[in-house]
């Protein structure tokens, strides 16, 4: 399955809030980070100009938000609809970002909630933990 990234628009906000609630609420609850609808909306709107919808076969299946810094790409959020999880789409998006970074001699960084099993995917793709805080592992690829 192939995908394309399309810049999110204000018309996508409802989808993005619902996607975030569907994909993040359980992990946030386990971490003790309880978030209401307003909190989810606030997170969606942070760096909104760097938010991209993940589309395949004319269907929107998720989103990725990343910052392209001079020395690295920082993945702020990656969320895939539940019915498309475990089908390799998250892997493909992360591999795309790793390749984008390598083309510019950069590395990729991200933070993942300690309760989120996506950490295993990131490790399989070459990420390693370089730091952590109370809630998250901070991970990076090699440059």
Task: Locate predicted features.
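Conserved N-terminal entry element of GNAT/NAT acetyltransferase domains
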Residues: 1-11, 141-143
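Conserved GNAT-fold acetyl-CoA-binding loop/helix
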Residues: 21-47
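Conserved beta-strand in the GNAT
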Residues: 53, 59-67, 74-79
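A conserved beta-turn-beta hairpin within the catalytic core of GNAT-like acetyltransferases
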Residues: 67-76, 85, 133-135
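A short, internal acetyl-CoA/4′-phosphopantetheine-binding micro-motif in the GNAT/acyltransferase core
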Residues: 78-85, 112-113
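Conserved acetyl-CoA-binding loop-helix of GNAT-fold acetyltransferases
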Residues: 86-99, 124
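Conserved GNAT acetyl-CoA-binding A-motif
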Residues: 101-113
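Conserved beta-strand-loop-alpha-helix junction that forms the acyl-donor binding cleft
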Residues: 110-119, 135-142
């Amino acid at each position: 399955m192939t995908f394309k990234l399309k810049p999110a628009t204000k018309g996508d906000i409802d989808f993005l809030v619902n996607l975030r609630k569907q994909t993040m609420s359980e992990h946030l609850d386990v971490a003790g980070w309880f978030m209401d609808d307003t909190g989810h909306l606030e997170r969606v709107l942070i760096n909104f100009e760097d938010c991209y919808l993940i589309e395949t076969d004319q269907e929107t299946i998720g989103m990725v938000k990343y910052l392209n810094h001079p020395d690295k790409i920082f993945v702020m959020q990656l969320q895939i609809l539940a019915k498309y999880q475990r089908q390799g789409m998250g892997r493909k998006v992360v591999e795309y970002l790793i390749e984008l970074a390598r083309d510019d001699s950069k590395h990729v960084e991200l933070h993942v909630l300690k309760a989120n099993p996506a950490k295993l995917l990131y490790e399989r793709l070459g990420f390693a933990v370089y730091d952590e805080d109370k809630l998250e592992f901070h991970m990076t690829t090699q440059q």
